[in-house]
C-alpha cells in the first residue's frame, strides 16, 4: 500500500492536512507494518518495495509505505504554486532530483557514464517525439477532429452506474 506524500494537497501543506506526524503511522493503527522512505532515493525506494513485495509473496500480508517526496511543480497546469509556497522552499529539500541522484550514484559505481546517459536521453527524446507525431496524425486539440461530447461516458464502465446514465441522458436533451 503506497502513499505518495509530495507534501502538498493541492495548495495545503501536508502538515495541515493530517492529524498525525506522518502518513506511515496511519498503517500502524490498522496493525499493518508501516515504513517511510525517501521517495527521491531510487535505491532506498526499490529496497523497501522489494522487501514489501517479498513479504506479501510469503503470505505475510500488506505493508504500508509512505513515499516521502517533493512536488517540484504545481498540482496541475492551472496551478500557480508561487501563490502559496515560499520561493526558496525547494532549497530545504535534501537530496534533490532523484534522476540526478541515481545517475551520480551509478557513475561513481562505474556502472554508468555521461556518454551512455546522453545517448539514452536522446533515444528517449526521439521516442517521445515520434509518439507525439504519430498521435498528432489522429488530430490534436487545436485542429481536431473532436469526438462527440457523449464519448465521455463510453469506454469507462463495464456497467454504467445509474447516476452516470442520468448525466448521459441529460446531455442528450
Segments predicted by a language model, with ranges:
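C-terminal intrinsically disordered, low-complexity extensions immediately downstream
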Residues: 137-173
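Glycine-rich ThDP/TPP pyrophosphate-binding loop and its adjacent helix/strand module
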Residues: 1-140
Amino acid at each position: 500500500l503506497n502513499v505518495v506524500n509530495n507534501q502538498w494537497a493541492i495548495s495545503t501543506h501536508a502538515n495541515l492536512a493530517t492529524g498525525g506526524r506522518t502518513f506511515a503511522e496511519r498503517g500502524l493503527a490498522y496493525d499493518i507494518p508501516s515504513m517511510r522512505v525517501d521517495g527521491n532515493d531510487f535505491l532506498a525506494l526499490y529496497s523497501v518495495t522489494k522487501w514489501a513485495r517479498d513479504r506479501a509473496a510469503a503470505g505475510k500480508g500488506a505493508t504500508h509505505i509512505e513515499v516521502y517526496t517533493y512536488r517540484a511543480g504545481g498540482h496541475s497546469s492551472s496551478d500557480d504554486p508561487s501563490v502559496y509556497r515560499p520561493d526558496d522552499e525547494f532549497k530545504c529539500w535534501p537530496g534533490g532530483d532523484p534522476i540526478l541522484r541515481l545517475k551520480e550514484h551509478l557513475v561513481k559505481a562505474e556502472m554508468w557514464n555521461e556518454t551512455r546517459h546522453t545517448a539514452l536521453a536522446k533515444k528517449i527524446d526521439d521516442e517521445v517525439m515520434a509518439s507525439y507525431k504519430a498521435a498528432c496524425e489522429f488530430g490534436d486539440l487545436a485542429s481536431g477532429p473532436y469526438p462527440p461530447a457523449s464519448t465521455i461516458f463510453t469506454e469507462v464502465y463495464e456497467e454504467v452506474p445509474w447516476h452516470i446514465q442520468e448525466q448521459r441522458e441529460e446531455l442528450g436533451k
